Every structure is written in C-alpha cells, then in structure tokens.
Amino acid sequence: MSHCKFEQPRHGSLGFLPRKRASRQRGKVKAFPKDDASKPVHLTAFLGYKAGMTHIVRDLDRPGSKMHKREILEAVTVIETPPMVVVGVVGYVETPRGLRSLTTVWAEHLSEEVKRRFYKNWFKSKKKAFTKYAKKYAESTQSINRELERIKKYCSVVRVLAHTQIRKTPLAQKKAHLMEIQVNGGSVADKVEWAREHFEKTVDIKSTFEQNEMIDVIGVTRGKGNEGTTARWGTKRLPRKTHRGLRKVACIGAWHPANVQWTVARAGNAGYMHRTQLNSKIYRIGAGDDAKNASTDFDATEKRITPMGGFVRYGVVENDFVMLNGATPGPVKRVLTLRKSLLTHTSRKALEPVSLKWIDTASKFGHGRFQTPAEAKQFLGTLKKDVA
C-alpha cells in the first residue's frame, strides 16, 4: 500500500485495564462450579506448583479429521500437586448483596507451614497464632459443635480451608499457600460432616480431578517489568524519520479535553497479571511413588516424569502431578489454582479420549539425547568418573 491508512482498529484490549501488578501471587477463584446435590461430596479446586514443560506423542482420535489415527506431537505442562491438608470450614449465607460468611471453624492443630501465612516475620514473632483457639478443643468441644450446627442450619454454601504441603516440593519457601475451596455435592449437612471428618487430613489430586477432564488454570503471569508502548500494547512502529522515537504513539489525543485519555496506549508495567486460562485438558494424573509414572503401553521403559538432570530451575518431581495440554500462566515454581470447569463440554476435542504413546524425559538443559540414565550409560560405556 503506497498511501497512508487513515483508519484502523485500536491496538490492545481495554478489557484488562488497569495493567498493573497483581496484588497476590496465588490465583483467586472468583466463581466456583454450580452445585449438584445428586453427586457425591467433592472439592472443586486444587493448588499445585508449576514444574516445567515437556512434549508427548499420541495418536489423534478425531474421526473426520485428516490427522485421525495419526501421530501428533504436543507440548504439555507438568504441575506438581502434593496432597492438600484441610484445616477449616467456612459457611456462607445468601443475602440480597451476595454471599456473606456466617462463621469459620478451624481444626485443633495447625502445622507450622500454614501458621507462617499469618505472620510477616515468622522469625521475630512469638508464634502464638491459634493458641487460644486450640483451648476450645481442650476445654470442651461444645462451642465448636455449636458453630458447625449453625452452618448446617443457616448456610447454603460450604467451603473448606485447605493448604499446600510446600515442604514436600523443591521450593525454598517455607510458607504454605492457603485458600478456600468450595465443596459441592450432597446436602449442606453432608458437606459439613465431610469437612469435619477431613480436619487435619490430606486430600489428593485424584479425588478432585480425573483423566481427560477439562479444567481451568488460574494464576499470575510471568512478570516483564516496565515496557514501552509498542511491546506493551502492540502499536505500530512509526516511520524511520519520526522525531523523538519510533516505538511510541504519535498522537496522544486532542487539544481539548486538556488531558490524556485512559484509552491511549502508554508505557508502563507489563506482565505479572492475574489471568484465568479456560479449557486445559488433563492428559495424565501421576502418582509420586510410581517408578513408571512416565511410561506408556507403547513405551514400557521404566522412567519417572522428571527429565534427566531435573526440570530446569525447579528440580525433581517426587509427589503426585498432573499433566496438562499446552502452556499455563507464570514461570516455573509459580503456584497455580486448578479449578473444575464451569461449562458443560460437548465439543469433540473436549470429549476425545487421550492415550499417550511416548513422554519425553530427555534433559531440558540442552539437546538431550537420552531418556534415562541407563540408556546414557549403555551408549557412552564406562566413563572416567565411574572408574575413579
């Protein structure tokens, strides 16, 4: 085109303003799936830590597609999900202004890693959190039972307080992540009893999600610091002879009103924003104690999901994990909230059964050639370090 364009759509969406850093690193669940009393009692969300990415090979099962029954290669994300510990229950009452919490009941004993969540400086603190509350159990459980009965009588929504076991991961952080998870299925009394029975007990990922399920991933994206207008909004570079910079917006508004409108693309913070990624498919839920959690029917080699040398900047996955199709928000080590989907899925892609043929476990530090240490030893033979 040899002439100027006088009209074009704006660059960048205004629906995500303000583009500022997220207030907290853990993804917030702003809506839970609709409750169904006919189903058994179950949790609707789970927390995990992003370990890294790899790739898999599988046969596409999509009749009518040109790739039907042919091998395809896909990128996958591995999220480590140690069992979560239930430490409390919260009851919510429906009001004209929405849900309002009625009362909260905590467990008798709380671990140190979750108590750290209530202190800014654990080292200098007196560490007396929940000491008075624990006396209610020692003296009499009448007050505890009274609060639980209030939840059964007045509340319509029940959520449990559960925290991660961050000490079981390679992360250096000692402070566990705590969140409210809605309990769906059964009556309100069933939910309260389920929560009471699971006080100070663990809940694993397999009791919440299952193979081939479509879920949502909520987290905070990778932070990029301050970026210019072109990188932040995707505006067009100006011509070469433009005065005072090319990666800018040439006109930032009219003379009047005598201020810059909020819709004008400007430089500022990029990344580290709260995002909800919909419709991620679970390809595998692996057990941490399974020595063949990366093996398949096609590839019977005994190997774990951790690549040779460990996941880059993460380490070794020793707990339960979930493998999701594609990428997820945030860098490695970022805590991610996995939530059951709010939608009823009917598409062929969502209902397609997934059967993995091969999972790559080669080193991610370079061009890895070997899938297991035994394979590398067989190819390289005896090395000097083995003799010494």
UniProtKB/Swiss-Prot annotation:
Phosphoserine: residues carrying this PTM:
13, 65, 140, 143, 207, 295, 355
Instruction: According to the UniProt record, list the residues that bear Phosphothreonine.
Output: 372
- Quote the InterPro entries the UniProt record gives: L3_arc_euk, Ribosomal_L3_dom_3_arc_sf, Ribosomal_uL3, Ribosomal_uL3_CS, Transl_B-barrel_sf
- Pfam families in the cross-refs: Ribosomal_L3
| Compositionally biased spans, kind Basic and acidic residues | 1-10
Alphabetically ordered keywords of this record: Cytoplasm, Phosphoprotein, Ribonucleoprotein, Ribosomal protein
Query: Where mainly located?
Result: cytoplasm
Keyword Ribosomal protein present in the record's keywords: the answer is: yes
Composition bias (Basic residues) maps to: 18-31
User: Which Gene Ontology cellular component annotation is one that this UniProt entry carries?
Assistant: preribosome
Miscellaneous comment: There are 2 genes for uL3 in S.pombe.
Q: Which GO terms describe its biological process?
A: cytoplasmic translation; translation
- Give the protein's function: Component of the ribosome, a large ribonucleoprotein complex responsible for the synthesis of proteins in the cell. The small ribosomal subunit (SSU) binds messenger RNAs (mRNAs) and translates the encoded message by selecting cognate aminoacyl-transfer RNA (tRNA) molecules. The large subunit (LSU) contains the ribosomal catalytic site termed the peptidyl transferase center (PTC), which catalyzes the formation of peptide bonds, thereby polymerizing the amino acids delivered by tRNAs into a polypeptide chain.
Name used for this protein in its record: Large ribosomal subunit protein uL3A
**The family this protein is said to belong to:** Belongs to the universal ribosomal protein uL3 family.
* Localization annotation: Cytoplasm
What Gene3D superfamilies does the database record attribute to this sequence? 3.30.1430.10, Ribosomal protein L3, domain 3 (4.10.960.10), Translation factors (2.40.30.10)
What is the annotated quaternary arrangement, including any partners? Component of the large ribosomal subunit (LSU). Mature yeast ribosomes consist of a small (40S) and a large (60S) subunit. The 40S small subunit contains 1 molecule of ribosomal RNA (18S rRNA) and at least 33 different proteins. The large 60S subunit contains 3 rRNA molecules (25S, 5.8S and 5S rRNA) and at least 46 different proteins. uL3 forms together with ES39L one of the contact sites for the signal recognition particle that targets ribosomes to the endoplasmic reticulum membrane.
Keyword Cytoplasm listed = yes
Q: Which domain of life is it from?
A: Eukaryota
- The protein's organism comes out as Schizosaccharomyces pombe (strain 972 / ATCC 24843)
Where do the record's region annotations for Disordered lie? 1-34
- Single GO MF annotation: RNA binding
